[in-house]
């Protein structure tokens, strides 16, 4: 039998983590897939030097090689072809995290009424340039290959280009930049493209008729962000948005969604305004929307979403998700089928894959927790323990790896609920907003959805209009 040599194609790199040793990374999008032991063995043989025809390798493993070629992952080569240094196997001695959602500053040039971190007052400040650079090194050395940058307003950092340069030099992809749009201009987009980065710009828009200006505390804020959306569309940068719903803008939901669609925005998440300490101090409870009213607003609106041609991908909290141009929908509240065995699933799939780093360097499951001062104290500062330890043995790691069976054990209401499987624990940040601020409490929004039979109400409302997927 003639000798056979294979080489991994250059976009692909071999990676491994604690408890997930068999990973295949794809450049430059930095997506990673985990495979079984035999497939990874076959991938490891694709080094340009190993004769894969040798009978010492099991037939089961050798039979995988032609499939890798068909899929464009590897190719047949001559002896001596070599992997690049980046392609060679790297094993990270910590648990896997896909993305770091990073507040690189707590400072902001706007005065939003509901800010989680009171950014107008810069309550959490920002880390020094040297510390930020060291954290990028740690992110790289822990195998985190994607970051999204937020704040405060991330673009107010004077060393923002240095951050982009350092991330890019380490092949870390910037997936999103969360901005208010004020500093989004041609020069910024040129700089990002120069480093090979083309992130989505996620910019909040809280309604037509001056509502965005009112919530953000800046004159012409609405005009500014719509121009930023237009510029990104012209330059080929994807855009997304978030809309905070309250008593003053609830009647503008349909109109505002259509405005975003007209400006090329590809997706929007709608949620009620968070009753942060700043919101309650500056605006008050009377301007908030209770969950019961919120669901009725959503229920009234969803037929119009389809009537208006599904202008963007839309998420109405956990109540509804519809894709741009699609005639079907799904309900994020519905995590698992009623008969599924999900007891060993983590409390939150998003939190298990995405680390949130606060402006002071605190490791949190999500940005929403940054408004709960007492809860934050339970989680580590990466500047004190280091990222590797934080992703190995910490209160942060313990929480994001907590399983549903543990929630059901400590929360008897959830544990005995007939909807517990479909709900799958719902949202822990939402649970914190209920009286008692209990991280392992009930998510009142999910309780209302299931207990109030909104699944049936939604089906009836969309009968003949759209099908649930």
Annotated model-derived regions:
Residues 117, 129-150, 157-288:
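Radical SAM/AdoMet-radical enzyme domain recognition
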Residues 292-335, 362-363, 367-418, 462:
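C-terminal accessory region of radical SAM enzymes
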Residues 348-352:
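Short, small/polar residue-rich loop motifs at catalytic or cofactor-binding pockets
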Residues 1-120:
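N-terminal pre-core extensions flanking Radical SAM catalytic domains
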Residues 107-117, 365-368, 412-430:
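Local cysteine-cluster metal-coordination motifs and their immediate loop/turn environment
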Residues 91-152, 354:
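Conserved small-residue-rich
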Residues 135-151, 441-469:
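Short Fe-S-cluster ligation motifs
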Residues 27, 357-358:
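Short, acidic, Ser/Thr-enriched surface-loop or helix-capping motifs
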């Amino acid at each position: 039998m003639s000798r056979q040599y294979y080489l991994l194609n250059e976009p692909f790199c071999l990676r491994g983590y604690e408890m997930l040793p068999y990973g295949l990374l794809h450049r430059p999008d930095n997506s990673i897939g985990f495979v079984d032991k035999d497939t990874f063995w076959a991938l490891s043989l694709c080094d340009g030097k190993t004769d894969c025809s040798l009978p010492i390798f099991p037939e089961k493993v050798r039979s995988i090689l032609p499939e890798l070629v068909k899929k464009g992952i590897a190719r047949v080569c001559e002896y001596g072809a070599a992997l690049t240094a980046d392609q060679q196997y790297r094993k990270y001695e910590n648990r896997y995290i896909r993305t770091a959602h990073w507040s690189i500053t707590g400072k902001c040039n706007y005065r939003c009424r509901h800010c989680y971190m009171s950014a107008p007052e810069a309550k959490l400040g920002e880390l020094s340039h040297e510390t930020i650079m060291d954290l990028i090194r740690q992110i790289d050395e822990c195998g985190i290959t994607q970051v999204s940058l937020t704040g405060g307003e991330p673009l107010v950092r004077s060393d923002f280009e240095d951050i982009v340069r350092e991330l890019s030099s380490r092949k870390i992809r910037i997936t999103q930049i969360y901005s208010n749009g004020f500093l989004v201009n041609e020069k910024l987009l040129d700089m990002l493209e120069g480093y090979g980065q083309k992130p989505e710009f996620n910019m909040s828009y809280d309604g037509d008729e001056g509502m965005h200006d009112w919530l953000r505390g800046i004159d012409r804020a609405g005009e500014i962000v719509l121009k930023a959306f237009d510029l990104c569309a012209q330059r080929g940068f994807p855009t997304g948005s978030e809309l905070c719903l309250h008593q003053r803008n609830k009647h503008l939901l349909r109109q505002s969604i259509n405005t975003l669609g007209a400006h090329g925005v590809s997706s929007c998440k709608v949620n009620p305004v968070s009753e942060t300490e700043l919101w309650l101090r500056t605006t008050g409870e009377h301007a908030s929307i209770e969950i019961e009213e919120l669901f009725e607003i959503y229920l009234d609106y969803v037929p119009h979403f389809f009537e208006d041609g599904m202008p963007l991908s839309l998420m109405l909290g956990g109540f509804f998700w519809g894709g741009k141009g699609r005639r079907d929908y799904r309900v994020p509240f519905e995590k698992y089928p009623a008969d599924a065995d999900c007891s060993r699933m983590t409390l939150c799939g998003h939190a298990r894959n995405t680390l949130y780093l606060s402006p002071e360097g605190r490791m949190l499951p999500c940005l929403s927790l940054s408004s709960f001062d007492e809860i934050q104290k339970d989680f580590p500062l990466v500047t004190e323990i280091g990222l590797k330890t934080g992703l190995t043995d910490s209160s942060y790691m313990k929480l994001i790896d907590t399983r549903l069976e543990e929630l059901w054990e400590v929360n008897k209401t959830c544990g005995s609920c007939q909807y517990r499987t479909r709900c799958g624990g719902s949202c822990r940040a939402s649970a914190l907003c209920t009286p008692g601020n209990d991280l392992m409490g009930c998510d009142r929004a999910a309780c209302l959805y299931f207990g109030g039979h909104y699944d049936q109400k939604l089906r009836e409302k969309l009968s003949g209009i759209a099908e649930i997927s």
